[in-house]
Regions:
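Generic alpha-helical transmembrane segments of integral inner-membrane proteins
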Residues: 16-27, 185, 189, 193, ...
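Membrane-integrated ABC transporters
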Residues: 1-32, 36-185, 190, 194, ...
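ABC-type nucleotide-binding domain
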Residues: 15, 68, 89, 99, ...
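ABC transporter TMD-NBD coupling linker
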Residues: 46, 322-325, 341, 388, ...
């Protein structure tokens, strides 16, 4: 598959944009569980109060809290609020770092204050030495108490303070929920827009790759000599030019849309899970290990059959093409039954291989879902114990589940790749095999032109020829000269090399030994197009292309006039049957000339 990447250079800009959009989508998707956690924990449980830092506080309450702090902390808290108006202090604009420091100082002070209030102790009546002792005890206890419990006590204190000031707690909660909900909606829309753009661009890049590969394969095949055509076979070249390129194109769409996204969302999800400090990271390790074992096992079992699949498709195409091409011969010799059995055998082998591969892959999704649901149950079970101990909040557990599911989905995406990758990889190698094939008939670096003095002379000088891979020579030490105006005929039994000898002149094959010269120039030193333009070649089997009679007559001379076309038809003794047709030169010709007789 890596060989295909070098053919995507013209799309590098689009690929960079796709990766950037995938990061945007991943950022949005990873932010949503965090907002869900905040809505549950802060919006619902804490009534919209996020931490121990109140937006408003009575001056008397603030003074009471500062008495329960170290002097430096008290000064920092006092500086963060405006001077009292009507006995109310308001929080200034502060940075997030400052808010975290205030949260730590106020949270501890509020916890101590609530403890004293529950015991009916007035803080203003407590000596400073005793306050200092209580703070030291609170610090020691804080190390044993989870942050969640401290936060809950501080939030309760803030709620009571807001109620004492006459604030509408329901409205505060509703404002927080609406604000968080709109932020979630915005992120969801950004994620959706990024996903749509990625899908569009991925399809565009993959389609462009398919277009370029088809063009390159076509140009390469056109340059093949008969030796390369015999090596690949026509059926195989058709499969490689269509089905194989389609497989690669589909895979590249998945790579850009899903496979690149999987590691981004997976690594991001793992990072978020580690940041939660939930104590359940080991569950994630269990999930990843189970998924890895599942995917590797399925790949080991199915990969050999995937490699075999394309070969079987080639075989089926070959038999189908042979049957359709030789249909009249099959009917003439009444071998329909034999050909049916031959086709059925190839078709059955392809079906069995496909069934095996599909059965292997059908296990993947149910097992993935089993692992996913099992991990969810395990998280809820373990998380419930942590919540009961006060070490975890419900929203954090929900976020942990969502992050874990995102990580598992990343592996699920990669497993989808494992379904297509083996087959597409084989297809990519088969395409690369065509593109990397060295053409045996090459253009000379410095082409020569034949002498005008000896126009029309063809000379064979000690020519020998052996087909690629053959042990014996078809032609051995052939020497003769055909001069201008002479008619030379080759007479011999079947397989004696008559057609082979003629095929050497237009360089369908190159001689093994010796040389063929036209007007004194070795044909290997001539430009191939120039060489073939000097020859009139009539193949043993007539070939017509789909189109019209005129388009087929123009095949060797696109700029020919109607007078020249009529002259060619007269020479070929075709004028009579062309004139008899209603549309004349514009009469349609089917592929292979199947709608005209053999003589025509």
């Amino acid at each position: 598959m890596l060989k295909m990447l070098k053919y995507m250079k013209k799309s590098i800009g689009w690929i960079v944009l796709i990766v950037a959009l995938l990061f945007v989508q991943a950022y949005s998707d990873l932010a949503l569980p965090e907002y869900t956690s905040q809505i549950v924990d802060t919006g619902i449980q804490q009534k919209g109060i996020p931490d121990a830092v109140p937006e408003k506080i009575r001056e008397t309450t603030l003074n009471g809290l500062t008495m329960l702090m170290e002097p430096d902390d008290a000064d920092q808290v006092t500086a963060a609020y405006t001077e009292a108006e009507d006995g109310i202090c308001e929080l200034k604009d502060i940075r997030d770092e400052e808010r975290e420091e205030l949260n730590d100082s106020l949270g501890l002070a509020m916890m101590v204050s609530m403890t004293l209030s529950s015991e009916g102790i007035d803080i203003s009546q407590v000596p400073q030495e005793q306050i200092q002792m209580m703070l030291e005890q609170a610090d020691e206890q804080k190390e044993q108490i989870s942050d969640s419990i401290v936060t809950q006590m501080a939030v309760t204190f803030v709620q009571q303070e807001y109620a004492a000031m006459g604030e509408d707690l329901d409205q505060i909660q509703m404002n927080y929920l609406i604000r968080s909900g709109l932020q979630m909606l915005g992120l969801a829309l950004i994620s959706m827009l990024a996903a749509v753009l990625v899908t569009f661009l991925a399809s565009r890049v993959a389609a462009l790759l398919g277009h370029d590969l088809r063009n390159m394969v076509y140009r390469k095949v056109i340059s093949f000599s008969s030796a390369e055509m015999n090596h690949f076979s026509t059926a195989s070249l058709i499969t490689r030019s269509t089905n194989d390129i389609q497989q690669v194109q589909m895979l590249m769409t998945m790579v850009f849309r899903i496979v690149l996204y999987a590691p981004i969302i997976g690594i991001g999800g793992i990072t978020k899970v580690l940041e939660t400090e939930s104590g359940m990271t080991w569950i994630l390790a269990v999930a990843v290990a189970a998924l890895a074992v599942l995917i590797v096992t399925l790949l080991v079992v199915a990969m050999p059959r995937f490699r075999k699949l394309q070969t079987l498709i080639d075989r089926l195409n070959l038999i189908t093409r042979e049957i359709l091409t030789g249909l009249s011969v099959i009917r003439a010799f009444s071998t329909e039954k034999h050909e049916e059995e031959r086709f059925e055998e190839a078709n059955h082998r392809l079906m069995k291989t496909n069934l095996f591969v599909n059965r292997c892959m059908t296990f993947m999704m149910p097992l993935m879902m089993l692992i996913m649901n099992g991990i969810s149950v395990l998280i809820v079970y373990v998380g419930a114990h942590h919540i009961d101990e006060g070490a975890l909040q419900v929203g954090d557990m929900m976020a942990f589940i969502q992050y874990t599911m995102q990580i598992i989905m990343a592996f699920l995406m990669i497993s989808m790749l494992s379904v297509m990758l083996p087959r597409a990889s084989v297809s990519a190698n088969r395409i690369a095999e065509i593109l990397d094939t060295e053409v045996s008939i090459r253009e000379p670096e410095q082409p020569k032109k034949p002498s005008e003095d000896r126009k029309g002379e063809v000379a064979f000088s000690h020519v020998s020829f052996r087909y690629p891979g053959a042990e014996e020579e078809v032609l051995h030490d052939i020497t003769f000269t055909a001069k201008k105006g002479e008619t030379v005929a080759f007479i011999g039994s079947t397989g004696s090399g008559k057609s082979t000898l003629v095929n050497l002149i237009p360089r369908f094959f190159d001689v093994t030994e010796g040389a063929i010269c036209i007007d004194g120039v070795d044909i290997r030193d001539m430009d191939i197009k120039d060489l073939r333009s000097r020859l009139g070649y009539v193949p043993q089997k007539g070939v017509l292309f789909s189109g019209t009679i005129e388009s087929n007559l123009r095949f060797g001379a696109q700029e020919a006039s109607m007078e020249e076309l009529n002259k060619a038809a007269d020479i070929a003794q075709a004028s009579e049957f062309i004139a008899a047709k209603d549309d004349g030169m514009q009469s349609p010709i089917a592929q292979g000339g199947t709608n005209v007789s053999g003589g025509q």
